[in-house]
Amino acid sequence: METLSYSQIKKRKADFDEDISKRARQLPVGEQLPLSRLLQYSDKQQLFTILLQCVEKHPDLARDIRGILPAPSMDTCVETLRKLLINLNDSFPYGGDKRGDYAFNRIREKYMAVLHALNDMVPCYLPPYSTCFEKNITFLDAATNVVHELPEFHNPNHNVYKSQAYYELTGAWLVVLRQLEDRPVVPLLPLEELEEHNKTSQNRMEEALNYLKQLQKNEPLVHERSHTFQQTNPQNNFHRHTNSMNIGNDNGMGWHSMHQYI
């Protein structure tokens, strides 16, 4: 076995170092953060804005995103409406006439935010998209209570928005109630609740109330039909529902017309 002297080892090391120095050094290049990191450090509002901009530029993305994102629960929708209503009430100026033009101009943006939210959410609880009568009624009841709490003003022009909301709620009510015409099992009709809604709205929901009264008048026929159905399907039970309802125009699509007002 060959034994290397110190001088030989030193020479070999020098030759090796010389080879390294002749190699092309790969230097780093500046670049932005990876997309995953950018998303991690972006706040929710930024991501929301970016997503909407991408959908506007690439409409096909909307279908894919709808297929991925889960629909919000009813509780979430109602909570959103309540928060918007709180923001509206908190935006009133301190002191002064809260029914005057100045007050309306101060709260107008928050007022419209409530209407826009209703405009987006109500159709999600109407057939044919939503066919569950009880769920539809529950949401419409909550939405009606929100409209009841919208402020009114001395200037009748400022009250057009609320009147239109009642009109649309009435139509949605009619659409949901008409689901019962073909149902073999009919839930308990919430007549008292709708009467209270109509009273609070100053008879602006009378059309839906009259329709519900007509349903109640035909209730013996309905129950006879239901009894026959139960005899052939004994496992089915009557659905009991004590909540209320409301919203829309004759064909249930009236919320689309809200855009001309807001």
From Swiss-Prot:
Matching InterPro entries, A to Z?
A: Cut8/Sts1_fam (IPR013868), Cut8/Sts1_sf (IPR038422)
Q: Name one Pfam family in it.
A: Cut8
Where in the chain are disulfide-linked cysteines found?
none
> PTM comment for this protein?
The N-terminal part (residues 1 to 72) is polyubiquitinated by rhp6, which is required for the interaction with the proteasome.
Location in the cell reads: Nucleus envelope
Q: Might you name a Gene Ontology BP term for this protein?
A: proteasome localization
Q: Name one GO molecular function term.
A: identical protein binding
Tell me where it mainly resides.
nucleus
Query: What does UniProt give as GO cellular component?
Result: chromatin; nuclear envelope; nuclear periphery; nucleus
Position of the signal peptide = none
Could you tell me the keywords of this UniProt record? Nucleus, Ubl conjugation
Quote the subunit structure annotation: Binds the proteasome.
Similarity comment: family membership:
Belongs to the cut8/STS1 family.
Query: What does the protein in this record do?
Result: Together with nucleoporin alm1, tethers the proteasome to the nuclear envelope. Involved in ubiquitin-mediated protein degradation and facilitates the degradation of nuclear proteins like mitotic cyclin and cut2. Required for normal progression of anaphase.
- Give the protein name, as stated in the record: Tethering factor for nuclear proteasome cut8
Source organism per entry reads Schizosaccharomyces pombe (strain 972 / ATCC 24843)
